[in-house]
Design a protein with these regions (language model features):
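Catalytic phosphate/metal-binding cores of nucleic-acid and nucleotide-processing enzymes, i.e., regions
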Residues: 1-114
C-alpha cells in the first residue's frame, strides 16, 4: 500500500468518532485536542463504555503509525489502573476493542513505544 493511499490519522479519528456517535450506547466519547494546556501523550479518543469502564483509544495510520514512548507509557498506566487501552487504525478495530472492554478484558500485552 503506497503511503499516499494510507488514510491520515485525522481521517481515522473522524471515522471512529462518527461510528461511536452513530452507534450510541456509550456514556461519553470525545477527541482530546492538543493545545498549550493539554497533557502530551493522552489517547486521541476517550470513551466510557457500556459498563462504565474508561477506554483510551490511540489512533494511528494503518501500517505506518507508531506509538511514541510517552503514548505507550500512558496506555500502560490506563491498563494498570483498570481501564482498557488500545491502539486502533480502523472502525473495525474499535468494534473489537469496545467488545473486549465490555467483556471485561484486560490488555493482554504491554505497549512499547517507538
Amino acid at each position: 500500500m503506497a503511503a499516499e493511499s494510507i488514510p491520515l490519522e485525522k481521517t481515522v479519528v473522524n471515522q471512529i468518532l462518527k461510528w461511536l456517535k452513530e452507534t450510541g450506547g456509550y456514556a461519553y466519547c470525545y477527541k482530546s485536542h492538543g493545545s498549550a494546556y493539554a497533557r502530551s501523550g493522552l489517547p486521541d479518543i476517550v470513551v466510557i463504555d457500556k459498563r462504565g469502564r474508561f477506554v483510551g483509544l490511540e489512533c494511528k495510520r494503518p501500517k505506518v503509525g507508531r506509538l511514541t514512548i510517552l503514548q505507550a507509557k500512558i496506555l500502560n498506566q490506563i491498563a494498570e489502573s483498570g481501564g482498557y487501552a488500545a491502539v486502533v487504525t480502523s472502525v473495525e478495530e474499535v468494534i473489537q476493542a469496545m467488545a473486549a472492554s465490555e467483556a471485561g478484558a484486560a490488555v493482554g500485552r504491554r505497549f512499547i513505544g517507538g
